[in-house]
Amino acid sequence: MQMPKTLRIRNGEKVKSTFSAQEYANRHAKLRAHLAAENIDAAVFTSYHNINYYSDFLYCSFGRPYALVVTQDDVISISANIDGGQPWRRTVGTDNIVYTDWQRDNYFVAIQQALPRARRIGIEHDHLNLQNRDKLAARYPDAELVDVAAACMRMRMIKSAEEHEMIRHGARVADIGGAAIVEALRDQVPEYEVALHATQAMVRAIAETFDNVELMDTWTWFQSGINTDGAHNPVTTRKVNKGDILSLNCFPMIAGYYTALERTLFLDHCSDDHLRMWQANVEVHEAGLKLIKPGMRCSDIAKELNEIFLKHDLLQYRTFGYGHSFGTLSHYYGREAGLELREDIDTVLEPGMVVSMEPMIMLPEGRPGAGGYREHDILIVNENGAENITKFPYGPERNIIRK
């Protein structure tokens, strides 16, 4: 029996898209204008973020590749048979082609069905691995493969009004997660119990806000003591002690859109040495909030904030840049690296951009005030300055939690 290489699975009805039809039409139009200007026949996206951004389909890879083929006429998602009809139900576009596991490299067969011929194909240099790039090139021996990832990132950096609304919801849900952390916090509670409580609260809040939403990827990092030394350190079984430095990190994920709340906390009391470090980091945070406005250069913001840390002899303990862009991204996809508050980024802030202000310093064990300190707010840049959409309190006056 000859089994098929590809399928169409039209199972059920199309679901309500995350954004309006006009929103996706605007995204497609901007992309197509870029393709036309660069004489690119089609874009073959492979990343979570661009496939989600242009089609509203956020795939679950599990080791399989996915794609979105965009031409001047079509938007076609390429998905694996294991997903059934879900990719078709979600895709905002003209078609969905399913590839099967019956033969090797049916993925590329599906791409060729979506794009029979092309002279110039846009790919994502920062995502498509070398093996699959070579296989794609072999399917189109006369085509030139060129990068579109950087240009698409620049398009994503300016958020629409609908995206702003989504990010506002995310910031609100993150604040709910933060409140749940404080609620669960007590002496000798394990980190994972606090994190579980916060994640459950956020997932429920997302479900209450959005109809027919896919609930995936929302998470919490709650770190205590030495575990605060890395911003992305995993949750552990460590138990919280009175006087511990604590790091609250809540990340609601809504339709692939990321938001975050991050705060330094202490349980019961805070030593004088810790308080000095904390207050210095808060000083930088507050200064940074005032610098987020149109016309400011990312590198200039970083340099100005460096001076405050220098004043406190703490610059050597800074661990990363002062903030980054938001949008369709997560801890495993979508970093908009062109919009980060770092010394090596000269991007100028514009209305519509969404950035965080999140200074962090880390003093190693054995030093007075040891631990990692971080405050994180989200700001929407507008014509007159920026709107801070994070409402959860920060600093020693509010976040020494006494129970």
Curated annotation (Swiss-Prot):
InterPro entries, sorted: Creatin/AminoP/Spt16_N, Creatinase/aminopeptidase-like, Creatinase_C, Creatinase_N, Pept_M24, Peptidase_M24B
Keywords: Hydrolase
Presence of keyword Hydrolase: yes
Annotated EC: 3.5.3.3
MF GO annotations: creatinase activity
Active site: 232
Source organism, top-level taxon: Bacteria
Known catalytic reactions: creatine + H2O = sarcosine + urea
Pfam families associated with the record: Creatinase_N (PF01321), Peptidase_M24 (PF00557)
Keyword field contains tRNA-binding: no
Subunit text: Homodimer.
Record family assignment: Belongs to the peptidase M24 family. Creatinase subfamily.
Protein name in the entry: Creatinase
Organism whose genome encodes this protein: Flavobacterium sp. (strain U-188)
